[in-house]
């Protein structure tokens, strides 16, 4: 059991009892409800307790790519810098990068993430050790080559079977075809079939740049969402579409009809000058918006509080509308909506929800006066949290990682980067 005492929970000072990995009770808790010998006490005095943040689009091992290629367009960034470095990846490098990235996420209040990358054994090992929650997909790219396609699909299937056999509720699988401009029709059709077979979501990059959209139009005569919809890619599956920057009205209608989730990455899209997603149109069509950081190579951090602030500000400015995205909506993009997208019973602090939560010390200049804490968490907070509980276990205590030696991880990360950069 965990007993949180005297924290600000849902707007008022109260206690919260966790039993196993579930929030059992919020409010007044009697001594008879608590097993003294088996209960960890968290002093919530001067703290606000919030649901853990959920990052719905990232490439966690790319924490090692931080700062390697700034201030260039996406295609130059990929072909000139990222893909050449990724050709040097190995299990050791991905493990170090994942450890580094998960520590960064936990220490900034993220309790779950949706990832697409390579060397999944190494990602899973790091996720298991740090205690974070994750949905993981092998990133498939066949570049329209049949031999490559068969290898990618084989690896994807093996990855899903491996994750299923873990029988770990914190680690779930997904399918991750990279994008319509890097994947053949055949691999995309097979992706849908695999997703239905394993009952997992599809995680895919969609309409990030004008250039990639033009590539798909030139090859198929249709825009990306129209093209994928023409052969049933979105049928009977949950699809999490990363970016969604340049969308036609017909594509928005397809997203609405097929109940898709948009994973908005405002900071990455701004840094790569990709554009700004039409979030207001998505909301008008009841398309759920979630938030992602993307990888550190294009952000350059994994602090989801920055995305929450960015989404609240950008759409006000672009639309000349001060209520375009409210603070409440922005916060829910990073919590409640992300939980729905990844089918996690969290994103809110309620009895019966998973015990994935964060405590933040309000005795900070940027969180004062505390009476306006809901505003501060969106507009003035820097993301430095005090305590993180995931799946009913304390993984960050007073700002210190519980399961991992941080100093050793930083050493591993420096060694891994040296190997990547040489």
Swiss-Prot record:
Coiled-coil features, chain-numbered ranges: none
CDD domains, alphabetized: ATZ_TRZ_like
Catalytic activity line of the entry: 5'-deoxyadenosine + H2O + H(+) = 5'-deoxyinosine + NH4(+); S-adenosyl-L-homocysteine + H2O + H(+) = S-inosyl-L-homocysteine + NH4(+); S-methyl-5'-thioadenosine + H2O + H(+) = S-methyl-5'-thioinosine + NH4(+); adenosine + H2O + H(+) = inosine + NH4(+)
EC number(s) stated in the UniProt entry for this protein: 3.5.4.41, 3.5.4.31, 3.5.4.4, 3.5.4.28
InterPro entries the record matches: Amidohydro-rel (IPR006680), Deaminase_MtaD/DadD (IPR023512), Metal-dep_hydrolase_composite (IPR011059), Metal_Hydrolase (IPR032466), MTA/SAH_deaminase (IPR050287)
The record's free-text note on cofactor binding: Binds 1 zinc ion per subunit.
Residues annotated to bind Zn(2+): 57, 59, 205, 294
Annotated substrate binding sites: 86, 178, 208, 294
GO molecular function: 5'-deoxyadenosine deaminase activity; 5'-methylthioadenosine deaminase activity; adenosine deaminase activity; metal ion binding; S-adenosylhomocysteine deaminase activity
Cofactors that this protein relies on: Zn(2+)
Keyword list, A-Z: Hydrolase, Metal-binding, Zinc
Biological process, per Gene Ontology: S-adenosylmethionine biosynthetic process
Gene3D superfamilies: Metal-dependent hydrolases, Urease, subunit C, domain 1
Superkingdom of origin: Archaea
Entry keyword annotation includes Hydrolase: yes
Pfam families noted in UniProt: Amidohydro_1
Pathway, per record: Amino-acid biosynthesis; S-adenosyl-L-methionine biosynthesis
Subunit structure: Homotetramer.
HAMAP family in UniProt: MTA_SAH_deamin
The protein's role, per its UniProt record: Catalyzes the deamination of three SAM-derived enzymatic products, namely 5'-deoxyadenosine, S-adenosyl-L-homocysteine, and 5'-methylthioadenosine, to produce the inosine analogs. Can also deaminate adenosine. The preferred substrate for this enzyme is 5'-deoxyadenosine, but all these substrates are efficiently deaminated. Likely functions in a S-adenosyl-L-methionine (SAM) recycling pathway from S-adenosyl-L-homocysteine (SAH) produced from SAM-dependent methylation reactions.
Note: SAH is a product of SAM methyltransferases and is known to be a feedback inhibitor of these enzymes. As a result of this inhibition, organisms have evolved efficient enzymes to metabolize SAH via different pathways. The pathway found in methanogens differs from the canonical pathway, it uses the deamination of S-adenosyl-L-homocysteine to form S-inosyl-L-homocysteine for the regeneration of SAM from S-adenosyl-L-homocysteine. 5'-deoxyadenosine is a radical SAM enzyme reaction product which strongly inhibits radical SAM enzymes.
Similarity field: Belongs to the metallo-dependent hydrolases superfamily. MTA/SAH deaminase family.
Name of the featured protein: 5'-deoxyadenosine deaminase
UniProt source species: Methanococcus maripaludis (strain C5 / ATCC BAA-1333)
Gene: dadD
């Amino acid at each position: 059991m965990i007993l949180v005492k005297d924290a600000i929970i849902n707007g008022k000072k109260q206690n919260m009892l966790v039993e196993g990995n579930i929030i059992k009770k919020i409010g007044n808790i009697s001594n008879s409800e608590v097993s003294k010998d088996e209960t960890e006490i968290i002093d919530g005095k001067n703290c606000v307790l919030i649901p853990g943040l959920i990052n719905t689009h990232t490439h966690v091992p790319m924490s090692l790519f931080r700062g390697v290629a700034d201030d260039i367009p996406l295609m130059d960034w990929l072909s000139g810098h990222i893909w050449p470095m990724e050709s040097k990846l190995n299990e050791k490098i991905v493990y170090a990068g994942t450890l580094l990235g998960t520590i960064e996420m936990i220490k900034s209040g993220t309790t779950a993430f949706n990832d697409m990358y390579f060397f999944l054994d190494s990602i899973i090992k790091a996720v298991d050790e740090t205690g974070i929650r994750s949905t993981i997909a092998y990133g498939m790219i066949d570049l329209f080559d049949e031999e490559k396609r068969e290898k990618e699909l084989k690896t994807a299937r093996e990855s899903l079977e491996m994750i299923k056999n873990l029988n770990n509720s914190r680690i779930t699988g997904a399918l991750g075809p990279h994008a319509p401009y890097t994947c053949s029709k055949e691999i995309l059709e097979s992706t849908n079939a695999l997703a239905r077979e394993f009952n997992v979501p599809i995680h895919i990059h969609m309409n990030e740049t004008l250039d990639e959209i033009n590539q798909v139009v030139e090859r198929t005569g249709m825009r990306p969402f129209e093209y994928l919809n023409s052969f049933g890619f979105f049928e009977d599956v949950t699809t999490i579409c990363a970016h969604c920057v340049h969308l036609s009205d017909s594509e928005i209608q397809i997203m609405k009809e097929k109940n898709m989730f948009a994973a908005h990455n405002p900071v990455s899209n701004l840094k790569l000058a990709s554009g700004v997603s039409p979030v207001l149109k998505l909301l008008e069509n009841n398309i759920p918006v979630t938030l992602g950081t993307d990888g550190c190579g294009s952000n350059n951090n994994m602090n989801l509080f920055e995305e929450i602030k960015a989404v609240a500000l950008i759409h006000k400015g672009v639309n000349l509308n001060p209520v375009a995205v409210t603070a409440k909506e922005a916060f829910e993009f990073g919590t409640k909506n992300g939980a729905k997208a990844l089918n996690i019973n969290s994103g809110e602090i309620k009895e019966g929800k998973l015990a994935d939560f964060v405590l933040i010390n309000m005795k900070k200049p940027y969180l004062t006066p505390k009476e306006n804490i809901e505003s501060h968490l969106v507009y003035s907070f820097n993301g430095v949290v005090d305590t993180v509980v995931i799946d009913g276990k304390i993984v960050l205590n007073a700002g210190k990682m519980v399961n991992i030696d941080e100093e050793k991880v930083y050493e591993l990360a420096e060694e891994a980067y040296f190997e990547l950069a040489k």
